Amino acid sequence: MRVCVLSDSHYFTGRLNTILMKTAAEGPIDALIHLGDGYDDLRALDTPLPPVYQVAGNCDLFRSDTRNIIELSGARLLLTHGHFQHVKNGTDELLETALEENCRAALYRHTHVQKMERRQGVLLLNPGAAASGRYAVLHIGPDGAVEAELRSL
């Protein structure tokens, strides 16, 4: 399964469209994950979208869905913008939540800095800010194994 992961589009829908077109040109996108700060941006696109999973960020006013756990191809994924897990101070709290929820990956944002690390068997992935042309592609194997690539336009 191939998943495009992005966040912090901040109304730069042109960049979102470019990211999606570039990713789709490399192969089918099975799902799209948006991690907040641009919650409604995907609705502004004129292109057909794969299934979308998203959470709200600190700039998405009047939204309370700031955390979600989904299962794709047998892998449990924690989705969060990260501001309530204090990711600007590190990923320990995020990792703890992912472990408690038996997640193979925790996808987060808020810092606008791309980062990928694996700790205690959990992939911690920050795709970077889509408004700056940064995103990630997640690969989920048939056994639920999760790998990722950080990308930039």
Tell me what each language-model feature is.
Residues 10-14, 39-43, 59-64, 85-89, ...:
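Active-site environment of divalent metal-dependent phosphoester hydrolases
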Residues 73-108, 113:
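Mid-chain, well-packed structural core segment of small domains
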Residues 5-7, 31-37, 53-58, 78-81, ...:
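Active-site neighborhood of phospho(di)ester-bond hydrolases with catalytic His/Asp-centered motifs
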Residues 17-18, 44-47, 66-67, 91-92, ...:
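Short amphipathic alpha-helical segments
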Residues 1-49:
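N-terminal active-site segment of His-dependent metallophosphoesterases
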Residues 18, 22, 71-73, 99-102, ...:
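Binuclear metal-dependent phosphoesterase catalytic core
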Residues 47-87:
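Helix-adjacent hinge/juxtasegments
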